[in-house]
Structure formats: C-alpha cells, structure tokens
Amino acid sequence: MDGAIIGIVCKNDNVSEPDDDTTIKEKTYPEPNWIKWPAIKKPNFSHGKVLSDIRTHIDDGGYYNDSDLITAGHETTHGINSVIRNKFYQGKPTNAFYCLEDRAIILNEPKTRIEVVAREVPRSLRGGVYDLYLVQQAASGWGDRALYLCDEWVSYT
C-alpha cells in the first residue's frame, strides 16, 4: 500500500554539525505497519462519505455523536485511534491512526517528548492551538507521546 511517512524532527543538542560540506546521512526507518481496519456496521450516508466512513469503524453507542459534524468526526477518529492503539499494544509505546477507507497505521512512539517538539516550532508559527496541544496536553500526561500531535492532525483531517 502506498502512503507517506510522517516524521517529527527534533534538534539533538548533543550532536555537532559538520564544519565542512559533509553529507549527513538520513536514518532509515522500517516501513510502518499498515493494517486493514474493516467497518463494523453499515454506513449511513446522510452526513457525507467521510463522516459515514468514520462512524462505521467504531461501536461507541453514540458516545461521540455531536450536533457539530466536524466535532463528531474529530472525536470519533480519536476513539477509533484509541481502540486500534489498545488492541495492538505490545508493551512498548505505540500509536495508531485510522486513515479512512478501512486503512490504519501503527507506529512506535519516537523517543522524544512533546516539549522537545514544541521548542522547535518557530514563534511565528505558534498559532491558536500551539498552547493547547504542545503545552497543556504535554503537561497533562501526553508529554512522552509525541505522536499525540499526529493523532490530533489525523483527527482534524
């Protein structure tokens, strides 16, 4: 299956930059674990294709229903991601993301913290959600789960 690999790049203060034109080789990572995550109920297309797709992949008893359809899609995606993450947990920090059309990806959490990622965001790019996702959530217990930021991104898209 074709797909993009998302990377969180953090500056490592313990590594010095070369003084010449030496090429720094990129680290190669294993191919992410794409899985099939089939629908568990029939779609109701009254809210459109994407929200219908999302809603067919969780049995939440209506927990994530919201009159604002964007909020409903966002929160339901978080719920699906959580179900997948918990199902495939094998004792090491892992995250999972539902990517529509019965596709999901499972990734190992990188060995970095959200606070480290936050320091690398230029002040000029720190918009309205910066404090919520990169400061408050990091302090609330998600700090060692840098892929939480991808969970938010996937849930908004």
Model-derived regions, located:
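Pan-zinc metallopeptidase signature
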Residues: D2-A4, T157
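Generic detector of short, aliphatic-rich beta-strand segments that form the cores of beta-sheets
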Residues: I5-V9
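Extended, helix-rich scaffolding/adaptor regions
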Residues: C10-I58
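Short pre-active-site segment immediately N-terminal to the catalytic Zn-binding motif
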Residues: I54-T71
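Active-site recognition of the HExxH zinc-binding catalytic motif
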Residues: I70-N86
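Post-HEXXH active-site segment of zinc metalloproteases
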Residues: V83-G127, D131
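Mature extracellular/secreted ectodomains of secretory-pathway proteins
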Residues: E115-T157
